[in-house]
UniProtKB/Swiss-Prot annotation:
GO biological process: translation
Species of provenance: Hahella chejuensis (strain KCTC 2396)
Gene name linked to the record: rpmA
Organism lineage string: Bacteria, Pseudomonadati, Pseudomonadota, Gammaproteobacteria, Oceanospirillales
Keywords, ordered alphabetically: Ribonucleoprotein, Ribosomal protein
Gene3D superfamilies linked to this entry: 2.40.50.100
Protein known as: Large ribosomal subunit protein bL27
NCBIfam families the record matches: L27 (TIGR00062)
Protein family: Belongs to the bacterial ribosomal protein bL27 family.
Cross-referenced HAMAP family: Ribosomal_bL27
One Gene Ontology term of the molecular function aspect: structural constituent of ribosome
SUPFAM superfamilies, sorted: Ribosomal L27 protein-like
Cellular-component GO terms for this entry: cytosolic large ribosomal subunit
Keyword Ribosomal protein applies: yes
Amino acid sequence: MAHKKAAGSSRNGRDSESKRLGVKRFGGQFVKAGNILVRQRGTEFHPGENVGCGRDHTLFAKQDGFVKFNVGGPLNRRTVSIVAAE
C-alpha cells in the first residue's frame, strides 16, 4: 500500500478590500455643495469654513466654491475650507 502523505494546505491567501480613502478634491478645484472632499479614518484633516464632517469623518462641501487647504492654529492642524465663488 504505497501512500503519499497529504500535502499541507496554505493558511494565507486573504486580504481586505481597499477602502479608497484619501483626498478626492484638491486645492483650487471648484466644488458643488455636497461634494466629498476627503475620505479618512479619524480627523487627519479638520473641517474649516463651509465644510461639514460626516460620522465616518468624511469631509464634504456645504456650499459651492473653491477648495482651500490650510495648516495652522496652535496644534498645527490641517484644515479644508471652501472659498465662495464670487
